[in-house]
Amino acid sequence: MKTLLIAFSLAAFTAAAADKPGTAKVTGTVVTPKAVNNISGFTLELRLYEYDPFLADVSADLVAKLRVKNLAHKKGKETKTEFTLTESSNIKPRRSYYITCFVIDAKGKRHLMGEKDGKRGLCKVLTGGNPNKVNLILRDLRK
């Protein structure tokens, strides 16, 4: 029983330490694979959102947005784009964070989507053991 109590205490301490406020800075690479068709003049848009994981019916808040204009890629060659998303915001306790990544045209239509390590799902970052550096791989939204 004493061992169980110590384990719970350590788990609570670790969770509290992980949620201490820090810098909400996310860095990484957006990879456009060889198979993606030629693109030119598009915009790469990355957004960092903050949400309360305990409130299901509340929308996430936009913390930072980065737009890289005139993105270009040639089919048959992998293209890498480095990014840094926000340096001035702080991580808030008991909040979670995720990023979105899209390639959009001049009218705002989304063509490509970035996924963490090429895996579908929410790209969580910064808290709960999630990284502050990510590798996003673009894919066609229609596939």
Q: Language-model features: where?
A:
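Extracellular beta-sheet/turn segments enriched in Thr/Pro/Gly and aliphatic residues
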Residues: 121-143
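A short, amphipathic beta-strand motif
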Residues: 24-33
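A beta-strand/beta-hairpin structural motif
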Residues: 64-88
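Beta-strand signatures of extracellular beta-sandwich domains
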Residues: 43-49, 98-102
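Beta-strand-rich domain onsets/edges
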Residues: 14-25, 39, 141
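Short acidic/polar inter-strand loop motif in beta-rich domains
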Residues: 103-115
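A short, solvent-exposed beta-strand micro-motif common in secreted/extracellular proteins
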Residues: 92-106
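A short beta-turn/strand-edge loop motif at beta-sheet boundaries
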Residues: 34-41, 55-56, 90-93
